[in-house]
Amino acid sequence: MRLIIIRNDNNSHSQINKGKEKDIMKKIAILGIILTFFTNLSFAAEVNVFSARHYDSDIQLYKKFTEKTGIKVNVVSGKDKALQKRIIEEGDDSKADIYITADAGRLGEFDAKGMFQNSMTSAIKAAVPKNFRSTNWTGIAKRARIMYYSPERVTANELNGMTYEGLADPKWKGRVVIRKSNNIYNQSLVASLVKNNGKKSTCEWSKGVVANMARDSKGNDRAQILAVAAGEADLAVANTYYLALMLSGQKGEEQQAAAKKVLPFFPNQGDRGT
């Protein structure tokens, strides 16, 4: 089995509103990495992709691949856990050639079960930075988990030098919203803090964040942004692309209007970065 991990990320405020030309170039770049995987499979007439993603852009990439190679792409879509369960249960009889999902946390868990094989090639090493790949999987896009704030209630001075660690600062008491800790995005964020600060420090940090919550954790990432827009909180943690989705109007006028009331902030710019 081969594995591709998909990540989505924007590294600055300006990148949230990419133009069509840059978007097309990004898709072409992603296609190039996917082709690297596909062409390393046996010279088969078709390839089976098990994907936990649900974006039309992926389908367009598969179509381009088929046009380029003549190899048919069969896509099996589903929730991440359901796909993993199926692959495990089918064992050696699984038809999965490539597994696509989001977040390294999910990949680490699945890889620990021995479900992947070495998929590294010189082409992947040349195209993907070392910190975005492992022996058994590679990232082909990235995303950031950032903060969103109300410009009406949060001052520039408060955000000066703001870090993820700063979410535990008592000055944010009753002002922070973030989804539940069982969410994989939050688990990966916590894992990065453990890596950089150690388990003991991160444990104390988590207690501080809970103490600063404006309300009990509930809802998805967009719900956190909506809470800030509604005045229920001043600071939210969510992935970058959700703001872009809301601003696009695809989720309705209410969410579009709410997205215009918040601003994104990229923490830890003074040290390891977002």
Predicted segments, located by residue:
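Short, Lys/Arg-enriched N-terminal segments with co-localized hydrophobic residues
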Residues: 6-24
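Bacterial N-terminal signal peptides
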Residues: 31-40
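Early extracytoplasmic/lumenal segment of secretory-pathway proteins
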Residues: 44-109
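Residues embedded in well-ordered beta-strands
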Residues: 48, 146-148, 263
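Extracytoplasmic ligand-binding site segments that recognize negatively charged/polar headgroups
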Residues: 52, 56-59, 95-232, 243-249
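Generic structural signal for residues in well-ordered beta-strands
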Residues: 73-75, 176, 262-264
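Extracytoplasmic/periplasmic substrate-recognition and gating elements
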Residues: 219, 223-226, 230, 238, ...
